[in-house]
Regions:
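Active-site gating loops and adjacent loop-to-helix segments of metal-dependent hydrolytic enzymes
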Residues: 79-111, 220, 238-256, 279-284, ...
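Histidine/acidic residue-rich metal-binding segments in metalloenzymes
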Residues: 147-157, 177-284, 301-323, 379
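Divalent metal-coordination and catalytic microenvironments
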Residues: 62, 73, 126, 196, ...
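Active-site mouth loops of central-metabolism enzymes
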Residues: 98-114, 168-179, 199-203
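Active-site microenvironment of metallo-dependent hydrolases
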Residues: 1-43, 48, 360-452
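His/Asp/Glu-enriched, well-ordered alpha-helical/loop segment
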Residues: 223, 244-255, 291, 295, ...
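Alpha-helical scaffold segments that flank or form the walls of functional sites
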Residues: 65, 82-133, 144-160, 186-189
Length: 452
């Protein structure tokens, strides 16, 4: 039986003013108790002194522990393709066209390389679960259509003991009900798809697409995760029909809608009505602030729309809302590094969530809420749950988003998988002394900080 013992842990979502002692037995949390004070134990290693996954007694020094991040919407197959697929206009339309043109030239091996690189980057930043959408372009033919899915499934298998990866093929059902192409879709599901995906708002007949996707989900008992209304045109609104189908087919808690950009410019009463109905149908939502801010509002002048959905209204409705990475260094989004703290910071900016409570909500949007959307069992920092977590060199949620700490210690099922240490050194003795003095004053000025 393996055991780990952690002292002086900060759990900001539990009680930011207290420190906790945590005992992990055989990859699960066994004991989580509030400490009466900061504990000094010489037999415990500090985070800086950790050198292997076998270190069992850890003094966390008041640093933050969060459950492993959950990235509810990525595109592992497209990531790091920007050098081969440019997007001069910066529009969604050009990104789609250019990526489709280049797709026949991508081998399974290359796609697998890019997907693996992205998954490892995500894991190193603290993400322990990913849901990735994968292109499945029927018009490209049988030789090409399965490449991305095959590559990402290979990565999922190789990393299964380290990170949870759910794979969602993006289906565009053929208009002519081609038997051969429908067989390809069913083959893709049987290969190991974890759900049914698509972008029906881009189809010529969105309602027919939605009907077909729900039928596939029913037939194979799969959840649905769709790109929905990724447009700054308020008249683009497939969400209405998706809500209808969710209610009719009794797919409550089994449908996720990503993007929802057109809700933002939509007339207030209509948007709020849709959000209320979405919450009643128990449809989950994912906001993608990086890609949406980059792609949307391209033709605006003066006041440029942010392109991000109505975050406050969705949260207030009671619907589950996650924030996720979407694309990483590709024609849809040229930036990013699969770091959900970076995405959390973008979300905080765009939704004006900068207060202490607002930042806690951001943390939930990259942990607890997406875990619910992905139906992850045994998740969270609680007794009996799997001990998958990230320790950050930060002492509060405000500290996290002020500094985006580089130093992170990533654990999966109680095992240390990755640690990053920031190399720092003041070459001037006087500056070094000031630095040490500043660090020593943390307890006096910040540890028990209360807002007036």
């Amino acid at each position: 039986m393996s055991q780990q013992h952690l002292l002086n842990v900060c759990l900001p979502l539990e009680d930011p003013g207290s420190l906790f002692e945590i005992i992990i037995n055989d990859d699960r949390y066994e004991k989580i108790t509030k400490q009466p004070s900061y504990l000094q134990r010489k037999d415990f290693k500090t985070l800086e002194a950790l050198n292997s996954s076998s270190d069992s007694f850890i003094d966390c020094q008041g640093y933050v522990l969060l459950p492993g991040f959950v990235d509810a919407h990525m595109h592992l197959d497209k990531a790091y393709s920007l050098s081969k697929v440019p997007n001069a206009s910066g529009t969604l339309q050009e990104a789609v066209i250019n990526y489709r043109k280049q797709s026949p030239h991508f081998t399974v091996e290359e796609i697998e390389y890019r997907a693996m690189k992205t998954a490892l980057n995500a894991l190193s930043h603290g993400t322990t679960a990913i849901r990735t959408h994968v292109n499945f372009e029927l018009p490209l033919g049988e030789d090409v259509v399965f490449r991305a899915l095959t590559a990402v499934l290979n990565v999922k298998e190789k990393l299964k003991q380290y990170i949870t990866i759910q794979v969602i093929p993006m289906f565009l059902l053929p208009d002519d009900d081609s038997k051969r192409e429908l067989e390809w879709i069913e083959q893709a599901i049987k290969m190991g798809a974890d759900g049914i995906g698509g972008a029906p708002h881009l189809a010529e007949n969105p309602e027919k697409q939605i009907d077909g996707l729900f039928s596939l989900a029913e037939k194979y008992d799969k959840p649905i995760d769709l790109h929905v209304d990724e447009s700054d045109d308020p008249n683009v609104c497939t969400l209405d029909y998706i809500i209808q189908k969710t209610m009719e087919r009794q797919f409550h808690n089994r449908v996720v809608a990503g993007h929802l950009c057109s809700l933002a410019p939509m007339e207030q009463e209509k948007a709020l009505s849709l959000i209320e109905r979405m919450a009643a149908a128990q449809i989950g939502a994912v906001t993608l602030p990086g890609a949406n801010m980059y792609l949307q509002g391209r033709f605006d002048q003066g006041i440029v729309r942010r392109g991000v959905t109505r975050i406050h209204e969705i949260l207030q409705s009671g619907a589950t809302l996650a924030a996720a990475s979407d694309n990483v260094h590709d024609p849809f989004h040229p930036f990013g590094k699969a770091d959900l703290l970076q995405i959390g910071l973008l979300t905080a900016y765009v939704a004006h969530l900068g207060s202490g409570e607002g930042l806690k909500q951001i943390i939930r949007m990259i942990t607890e809420y997406p875990a619910k959307l992905l139906n992850l069992n045994n998740y969270g920092v609680r007794c009996g749950a799997k001990a998958s977590f990230v320790l950050l060199k930060a002492r509060s949620v405000e500290d996290i988003f002020t500094n985006l700490p580089v130093e992170r210690y990533v654990f999966r099922n109680g095992k240390l998988l990755y640690q990053s240490k920031k190399a720092e050194h003041w070459n001037d003795r006087q500056l070094l002394m000031y630095q040490h003095e500043t660090e020593s004053q943390y307890v006096k000025f910040e540890r028990n900080l209360q807002y007036v």
